[in-house]
């Protein structure tokens, strides 16, 4: 982590958050865009090292960020100007996000801001058990985003492990990267 990068957070305290490209790009895919529930328009950094994003119909929970937090922190991040970066530093004081390559050279910049709100309890939407089903319907656009996330996490071997929980409850898509990052995508089924 670069020098002077404060990653602890108390109420009202300004900080810098570090996030890998995989986690940031994945979260940006699943966060809400211009939702009236303003707290969904950002990425939630959780104290246990997970990152979460949701638009209300699907959610992504991924791990692991390196920041030391006491509470959830929700940050809105602009789209990256480049895809050639290894990690991003989000500075909530200046409102600037900087993108760095694997040699810690800055390769781009954007804007970010902390969102003052309460992120939904993401653990409540993760099904605790699986159940067999003969038929289940999904919005194809949501499944296309699961495929994009799998390609982002592992371009050479795009694999997704689905856990079904009947045809009326959310399904979980498990994705992992060779670098150790993992993600769960919760997708609500459609009525058929």
Q: What are the language-model segments listed below?
A:
Residues 6-192:
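DNA polymerase processivity clamps
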């Amino acid at each position: 982590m670069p020098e002077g990068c404060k990653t602890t957070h108390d109420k009202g305290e300004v900080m810098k958050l570090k996030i890998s490209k995989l986690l940031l790009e994945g979260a940006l895919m699943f966060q809400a865009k211009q939702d009236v529930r303003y707290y969904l328009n950002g990425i939630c950094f959780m104290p246990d090292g997970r990152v979460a994003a949701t638009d209300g119909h699907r959610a992504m929970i991924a791990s692991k960020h390196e920041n030391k937090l006491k509470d959830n922190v929700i940050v809105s991040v602009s789209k990256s100007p480049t895809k050639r970066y290894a990690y991003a530093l989000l500075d909530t004081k200046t409102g600037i996000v900087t993108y760095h390559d694997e040699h810690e050279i800055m390769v781009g910049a954007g804007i970010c801001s902390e969102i003052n709100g309460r992120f939904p309890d993401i653990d409540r939407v993760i099904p605790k058990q699986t159940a067999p089903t003969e038929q289940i319907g999904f919005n194809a656009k949501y499944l296309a985003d699961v495929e994009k996330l799998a390609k982002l996490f592992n371009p050479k071997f795009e694999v997704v492990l689905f856990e079904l929980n009947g045809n009326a409850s959310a399904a979980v898509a498990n994705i992992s990267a060779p670098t150790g990052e993992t993600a769960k995508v919760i997708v609500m089924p459609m009525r058929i």
